[in-house]
C-alpha cells in the first residue's frame, strides 16, 4: 500500500490508539479518553496530535461531535488485491454476501482493519451521527456472530439491515442509535426468529474516496 507521510512516535501512538479503540468498541475515542490513555495533561494536547494526523492525511476530523474522527486509508497498488465487496439491498433468508447482494468492489486492503474486514456496507440516514458514522459513509464490517454489549453491530431483521449499538438482556436485544432523535429497536428473540447479527463495525470510509 502507498505509505502515509511519516508519523512521529507520538503520532503513531495516537493513531494506534484510534485503531485499537475502534476495534474494541466500534467507535473512535473522545479527546478526553485519548488524553487519559496516553497521559496527556489535557484534551487540548490530544487535539493537537489529531490535527497533525489530519494534516498528514491519516485521519479526518469531523466537527460538531466529540467522537468525530475517521481513519483514512491509502488505495492499494496491488493488482492482486481483490478489494472488499459493497453490500446493497439484502433479501430475507439469503446470506448477506450472496452474489445478488453485491453492488460492486472497493479497492481497500481488508488487513488495514483489526479484525480484518470482510465487506463494506453503505450507511443510510443519520441515526449514528454522534459517533461520526454519517449518511453515505461506507462501514467496514468484520463478519462474526460473537459480539459483546456496547459494540457497533450490523444486524438484520427480515430483509432490513441496520447499524446500531448492541445491548442484550436475556432474550431481548436492544439496538441503540447514536442520535437522540431515534428510539431503540427492540427485538424479542422468542418472538422474532428472523434476526441475525452479521458482524461488527471495524472502520469507516468516505464513500467519495474510493472506487
UniProtKB/Swiss-Prot annotation:
Keywords from the UniProt entry: Autocatalytic cleavage, DNA damage, DNA repair, DNA replication, DNA-binding, Hydrolase, Repressor, SOS response, Transcription, Transcription regulation
Keyword DNA damage among record annotations: yes
GO biological process: DNA repair; DNA replication; negative regulation of DNA-templated transcription; proteolysis; SOS response
UniProt keyword Transcription regulation, yes or no: yes
Residues annotated as site: Cleavage: 92-93
EC number: 3.4.21.88
DNA-binding region per UniProt: 31-51
Gene Ontology MF, one: DNA binding
Location of the active site: 127 (for autocatalytic cleavage activity), 164 (for autocatalytic cleavage activity)
Catalytic activity reported: Hydrolysis of Ala-|-Gly bond in repressor LexA
Pfam families in the record: LexA_DNA_bind (PF01726), Peptidase_S24 (PF00717)
Subunit note: Homodimer.
Its job: Represses a number of genes involved in the response to DNA damage (SOS response), including recA and lexA. In the presence of single-stranded DNA, RecA interacts with LexA causing an autocatalytic cleavage which disrupts the DNA-binding part of LexA, leading to derepression of the SOS regulon and eventually DNA repair.
UniProt cross-references to PANTHER family, sorted A to Z: LEXA REPRESSOR (PTHR33516), LEXA REPRESSOR-RELATED (PTHR33516:SF2)
Family: Belongs to the peptidase S24 family.
HAMAP family assigned: LexA
Protein name per its UniProtKB record: LexA repressor
Organism: Pasteurella multocida (strain Pm70)
Gene label: lexA
Amino acid at each position: 500500500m502507498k505509505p502515509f507521510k511519516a508519523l512521529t512516535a507520538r503520532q503513531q501512538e495516537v493513531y494506534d490508539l484510534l485503531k485499537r479503540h475502534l476495534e474494541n468498541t466500534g467507535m473512535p475515542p473522545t479527546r478526553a479518553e485519548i488524553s487519559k490513555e496516553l497521559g496527556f495533561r489535557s484534551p487540548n494536547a490530544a487535539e493537537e496530535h489529531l490535527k497533525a494526523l489530519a494534516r498528514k492525511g491519516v485521519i479526518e476530523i469531523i466537527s460538531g461531535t466529540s467522537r468525530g474522527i475517521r481513519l483514512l486509508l491509502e488505495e492499494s497498488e496491488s493488482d492482486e488485491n481483490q478489494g472488499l465487496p459493497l453490500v446493497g439491498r439484502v433479501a430475507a433468508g439469503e446470506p448477506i454476501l450472496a452474489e445478488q447482494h453485491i453492488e460492486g468492489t472497493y479497492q481497500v486492503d481488508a488487513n488495514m482493519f483489526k479484525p480484518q474486514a470482510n465487506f463494506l456496507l453503505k450507511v443510510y440516514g443519520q441515526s449514528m451521527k454522534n459517533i461520526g458514522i454519517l449518511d453515505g459513509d461506507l462501514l467496514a464490517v468484520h463478519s462474526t456472530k460473537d459480539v459483546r454489549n456496547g459494540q457497533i453491530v450490523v444486524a438484520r431483521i427480515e430483509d432490513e439491515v441496520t447499524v446500531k449499538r448492541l445491548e442484550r438482556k436475556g432474550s431481548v436485544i436492544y439496538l441503540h442509535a447514536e442520535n437522540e432523535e431515534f428510539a431503540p429497536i427492540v427485538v424479542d428473540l422468542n418472538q422474532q426468529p428472523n434476526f441475525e447479527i452479521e458482524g461488527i463495525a471495524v472502520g469507516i470510509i468516505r464513500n467519495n474516496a474510493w472506487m
